[in-house]
Amino acid sequence: MDSIYPLLRECLRGTTPPLVVLPANPVEAQRLHHHFVGKPAPGSALIMTTSGTTGTPKGARLSAATLRASIDSTHTALGGPGRWLLAVPAHHIIGMQVLLRSLHTGYPPVTMPIDDGFQLAALPDAITELLEGHHTQPQPQSQPQTQSQSQPQRRHYASLVPNQLDTLYQDLHSSRPDTRRTAEKALHACAQLDAILSGGAPLPQHIDDYLTAAGLTIVRGYGSSEVAGGVLFDGRPGPATQILSLIHI
């Protein structure tokens, strides 16, 4: 993962040719690449493959300015920049933005192995590493910083898709004591995060309600690959989002 960080830094600066992001699986990568047509338009920094939920996957062109605006908007909506846990595939925008947010703010992410699928039992150790690990300081700003700016309170986040939260919910209600114990440990670990950003699909309300009552801070994001991630957070527009009313048009 470290090998791609220099390329991603250049993407955020807009100083590199467009970086095309494809899955590590060569068969899947070739299948998706087959759908790419033409050359990226000028100003492209990153080409992300859409999920294909509503049709054939395609390459979404994202500029460096769009990526940075999404990063700042997300962190503002969550309460400030922080350190992130990567527990979703990085070839989707939800995972890629975890890496980009981390690079943009200077906090190295913690990567949770998911090659064999999401394992709830691995979540507590990953979150412990997230909470206890050292972080690099953000790059110095062009203007003098106040004490509160130069030593920001570290926050901790994770991006999880609804299926992962559903796994937690289902295992908490399992008839198997060992499964419940594993889920309870994961729940306790998740409760130590400042926020869990859920996106990629709708989160059932009963799961949101249950996990929130159990101590988790869940922020439901809504967006797409084409807009570099979330534009609404818990139904409210992020700072980089403008709502256009078409009622009178």
Indicate residue ranges for each PLM-predicted region.
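Conserved beta-loop-beta connector loops within the AMP-binding
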Residues: 240-247
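Conserved small/polar residues in nucleotide/adenosyl-binding loops
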Residues: 50, 247-249
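Conserved pre-ATP/AMP-binding loop-to-beta segment of ANL
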Residues: 33-49, 80-83
